[in-house]
């Protein structure tokens, strides 16, 4: 199985656990004289079984990420950490740029009101955000490509 397929299965398992949790909660109690819509015990057993499958998948995915290298020589684990850092950096730069340009609505209605000035270079921040966004897209393409090429480890 390819790493990408395992990632899809992990996502499906996580979604299934969430759905089962909701169904268990909805059927954990019922009113006297009525029957629950579903057997909460059976739903709970299914959720526990799905969690065991999920745990096995996560272990194999993490092993694969640690052992798989991207074309640039970094491990998948390092590339994933880099991607998260790039995402956080991009969000920070965009937020700072928006705040510096007054995107939150700091305008003057009267000439007697105080003028607001930007403490940060908006154009430079936007340029840096664009560069980071490009790096992020390129790295994400490498990661996705490798996900479909790498075999899932045991």
Regions found by a protein language model. Give the residues of each.
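Structural preference for solvent-exposed beta-strand-turn elements
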Residues: 1-154
């Amino acid at each position: 199985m390819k790493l990408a397929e395992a990632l899809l299965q992990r996502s499906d398992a996580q979604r299934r656990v969430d759905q089962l949790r909701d169904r268990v909660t909805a059927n954990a109690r019922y009113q006297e004289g009525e029957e629950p819509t579903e057997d909460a015990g059976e739903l709970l057993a299914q959720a526990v079984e799905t969690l065991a499958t999920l745990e096995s998948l996560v272990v194999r995915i993490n092993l694969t990420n640690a052992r798989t290298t991207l074309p640039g020589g970094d491990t998948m684990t390092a590339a994933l950490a880099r991607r998260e850092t790039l995402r956080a950096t991009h969000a920070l730069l965009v937020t700072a740029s928006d705040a510096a340009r007054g995107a939150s609505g700091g305008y003057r209605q009267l000439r007697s009101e105080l003028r607001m000035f930007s403490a940060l270079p908006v154009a430079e921040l936007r340029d840096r955000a664009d560069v980071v966004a490009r790096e992020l897209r390129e790295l994400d393409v490498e990661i996705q490509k490798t996900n479909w090429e790498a075999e899932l480890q045991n």
